[in-house]
Amino acid sequence: MVNKLAEMQCKLGHRCHFSVDTQQDLDGNTSRRCSKLSPVEGQISRWLAVFVAPLSVAVCLSVAEPAAAQSDLTIDGADCQYDRDRSRSSRRRAGGANRECLFVDAADEAEANADPNKTGSDSIESRVVVRNRPVAARSISPVPKPRPQDYDDPILVPDRWRIVDTLGYEDRWWDPYNQNTIKGDKPLHDDWFFNVTAISDSVAEVRQVPTPVGGQTTIAPGRIDVLGNYDQWAVLQTVATEFVYYQGDTVFRPPDWEFRFTPVFNVNYTEVQETLALNVNPDERDTRTDTHIGVQALFVDKHLRNVSDRYDFDSLRIGIQPFSSDFRGFLFQDSPMGVRLFGTRDNNRIQYNLGWFRRLEKDTNSGLNSVSEDLRDEDIVVANLYWQDQPTLGFFSQLTAIYLENRETDVFYDQNGFIARPASIGLEQPREYDVAYLGYNGDGHFGRLNLTASAYVALGEERSSVFDQRDSDVEAYFFAIEPSIDFDWLRVRASFLYGSGDKDPFDDKSEGFDAIFENPQFAGADTSYWIRQSTPLIGGGRVALSSRNGVLNSMRPNKEHGQANFTNPGIVLAGIGADMDLLPELRLSLNANYLAFAETAPVEVARAQGAIDDSIGYDLSAALIWRPFMT
């Protein structure tokens, strides 16, 4: 027998105290015996209930007269059933399933209450029947599962491109600053886009360039000087158009297909003060007008696959395509014909390029691709790897390996009639060479310090060097660095560049560094006189010390047609500069560079002149850029 003590609240609001004894007979029936306690006993039982952790029993007693010595107590089973149901519904096992509980129906023993001889201390005995009552499993939701017929027909909503049509935006094909289908703002059909871009570039250039007096004739008879009139001026008008037809979402993943065509139209006019400066024919005199249509891009790009849920990918591009081997265009930046496999890994942190290219012949006077000529007999195989946030956050690192194989042994004249291959210097003989370029490039910042760095080594072999008929080993190197720091609207930078030169043009080593097709964005770029203008090597052959848009002293006829020359004097450049954003629309750039030869031996041999100073001079430049629509 288990004695359970509890304090109960009577239906009339009075407090009474009792003890409940529970017994079970042999038939399994349970009987309950309730004994009324005296006030003192009730107080004791009340305190014991705090420490004994009782099991709650929901039993309500009805008391007719609290002060009477005898009371009729009735167990109200109906009222207590509600309380039992509440307690039962909240009991749960550890796994969340309901457990079965005992549902008790109480039957009053009227005979016990009807006996007037019984006192308050006598017991009142009631017999209750206990039976197991299963509890239904709870459903997950009281809401019934919808049936197929409960669904309405779907409402079609325009995609994120065409939904603007319902908002009243008009498509203006002539307005590039508003919604425009031919600008790629929304699909042309399905998920195919069409994008048209046009860029107009107008150049008026007044310059002074060292110009030799004509060999056969001159514009001013009677001159005996080597150098003629330096004054020149040129006007160039270029219109570049680009047509892109592509399929894809264009925002979070690369297009599935891309077809790109970039024709460029050029008209140029040049006037000089010396004969034979523009054309090998003296009858052409001192002016030249030329036009050309070049194809700078014509390729198809196929998205092969996605390799991660972040849309890292592999793509294949075939055709005439722009390519740059590094961040600043030191080694190879051109639009050759080729096949390129490229893609990304690790959420775009790693990028790679694998490619094979053949350069196109260039138009001599515009520098654009000439698709009417055969491809050059020069194979370029490229493999490079870009790694973001390496070695630190905010800095890009790149490793490059390029193999160059040149087999151009035929004589080639440019459109103005001057010989371009082989170069008119030294023995003027056909050459072949195989060179491997290995390099590291970095671009980014370390804290507030911005940094661009590039380093290359060129290793290989050339058959018949420029000044010697013997084969020669190519061993040359290159290094450039440009740190800068920002002070609000002002950026201050320093530049240093070194390209190795050849110490002895007649030994079996070619140590002058030369690029494949350079276009350096460095030390002022095309705002620098030395980089922008082609400086001729007067009296040393029909070559230039450095080509237009080039910084290396390669001693080629020009970089568009000429072969690489690894027997050159090299270059040393040290400079400082500043870029000032005076207004959002107005930028002022200042540059001051010092230039020198790394070695003077190749220049001395070419000119048959000794004791040539290694200092080239100072290059001072300023550029004012106004962008009226920049905000």
Region annotations inferred by a language model:
Residues R310-D312, Q321-S510, V572-I576, L582-P584, ...:
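Signature for the C-terminal beta-barrel architecture of outer-membrane proteins
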Residues T211-V213, D225-Q232, V272-L276, E284-D290, ...:
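Extracellular/periplasm-exposed beta-strand and loop segments of Gram-negative cell-envelope proteins
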Residues A49-S62:
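Bacterial N-terminal signal peptides
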Residues P142-Q149, N178-P187, P212-G214, T218-T364, ...:
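Outer-membrane beta-barrel channel domains
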Residues K503-R607, S615:
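C-terminal structural cap/anchor segments
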